[in-house]
């Protein structure tokens, strides 16, 4: 027994029987179709909208290839249409869709209800904890999974599942810089009218309409994005979450540059300063000397001295020059942390010392 969307005939019973929808010519016109109108509304960005369509088409065309990308739909309020989209996709992937109510569902034993699926969605999922976040990343891209049933030894099976999660919690997922697995979508904070919902569900409850959608995606040109291979698009929402999860030992330099400019600080003392900063600002202080050292050396390569232990020598940097260095290393983060507009270009000009500002003892 197997679940093989490639449908290779090797005399083994295949639990995958293909789509329930017959192949036919689709007459869907995207511009005035009720499903695509809502998908566009929820995507809230033309680039996200195009990626979303390619993502769906990828599963329809090549169900034997995972997308390796989970889509997270966030809105501050409910009723914007997030779950309506997942309901439609459950119908599109009829017989091969599943639902999780808690993030722990993907890690617990006796998980047969989540096997042999192409599409799985979760409501109000919270994966902000690092342990949960790391496990979720594995699930999104894993090619195999263990099937466990009570009283029966677990067996390894192929995993073709793809995920969408919906949430009203802005910080539901822990995002790290360089993440390749999550498409973070900030939906509009505008609830749909009751009549819009009624019309949408009337549409998707008609199997003929879903069949039309299936065939539309079956022939859709999804070559703009090589789903599962290309790096997932970076949205402003995802960038914001990544910045908010910037380690304390990096944030402290951008927040308080004046404390370090003009100083020569040993790596051990700088680590202690990072731990203190993290605790004072309710950030994670669970980082090792190795992690801290690797990242900080990368940030200040030209200022690392290794005489009698590692030191960071900023004595030739004024606060202005220190800020300028930080800006050059990560312009977007510098603007974010200083609440500056994305198109703002700072000028780093040393403030002239006025005669009256000179300390008479230094004159």
Question: Residues of each region from the PLM?
Answer:
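AAA+/SF3 P-loop NTPase mechanochemical coupling elements
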Residues: 110-115, 148-166
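Conserved catalytic/switch belt of AAA+ P-loop NTPases
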Residues: 133-155
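Phosphate-sensing "switch" segment of ASCE/P-loop ATPases
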Residues: 158-160, 175-243
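P-loop NTPase catalytic core of nucleic-acid-dependent motor ATPases
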Residues: 2-121, 125, 183, 217-218
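Positively charged interface segments
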Residues: 103-107, 151-152, 161, 178-181, ...
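Conserved nucleotide-binding/hydrolysis micro-motifs of P-loop NTPases
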Residues: 126-127, 168-172, 188-193
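Positively charged, polyanion-binding regions of nucleic-acid-associated proteins
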Residues: 244-265, 276
């Amino acid at each position: 027994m197997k679940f093989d969307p490639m449908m290779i005939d090797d005399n083994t019973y295949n639990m995958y029987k293909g789509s329930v929808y017959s192949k036919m010519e689709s007459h869907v016109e995207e511009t005035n179709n009720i499903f695509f109108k809502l998908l566009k509304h929820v995507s809230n960005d033309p680039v996200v909208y195009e990626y979303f369509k390619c993502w769906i088409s990828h599963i329809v065309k090549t169900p034997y290839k995972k997308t390796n990308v989970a889509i997270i739909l966030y809105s501050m309020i409910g009723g914007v249409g997030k779950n309506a989209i997942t309901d439609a996709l459950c119908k599109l992937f009829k017989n091969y869709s599943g639902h999780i109510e808690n993030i722990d569902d993907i890690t617990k034993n006796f998980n047969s209800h989540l096997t042999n699926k192409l599409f799985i969605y979760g409501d109000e999922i919270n994966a902000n904890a690092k342990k949960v976040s790391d496990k979720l990343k594995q699930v999104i891209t894993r090619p195999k999974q263990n099937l466990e049933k009570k009283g029966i030894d677990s067996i390894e099976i192929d995993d073709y599942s793809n995920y969408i999660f919906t949430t009203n919690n802005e910080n539901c997922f822990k995002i790290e810089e360089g993440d390749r697995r999550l498409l973070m979508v900030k939906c509009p904070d505008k609830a749909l009218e009751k009549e819009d919902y009624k019309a949408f569900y009337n549409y998707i409850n008609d199997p003929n309409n879903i069949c039309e959608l299936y065939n539309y995606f079956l022939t859709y040109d999804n070559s703009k994005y090589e789903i599962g291979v290309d790096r997932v698009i970076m949205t402003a929402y995802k960038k914001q979450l990544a910045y908010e999860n910037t380690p304390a030992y990096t944030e402290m330099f951008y927040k308080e540059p004046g404390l370090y400019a003009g100083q020569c600080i040993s790596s051990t003392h700088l680590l202690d300063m990072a731990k203190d900063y993290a605790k004072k600002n309710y950030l994670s202080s669970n980082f090792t000397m190795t992690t801290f050292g690797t990242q900080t050396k990368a940030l200040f390569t030209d200022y690392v001295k290794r005489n009698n232990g590692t030191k960071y020598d900023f004595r030739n940097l004024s606060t202005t020059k220190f800020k300028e260095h930080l800006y050059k290393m990560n312009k977007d983060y510098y603007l974010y942390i200083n609440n500056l507009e994305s198109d703002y270009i700072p000028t780093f000009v040393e403030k002239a010392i006025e005669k009256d500002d000179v300390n008479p003892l230094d004159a």
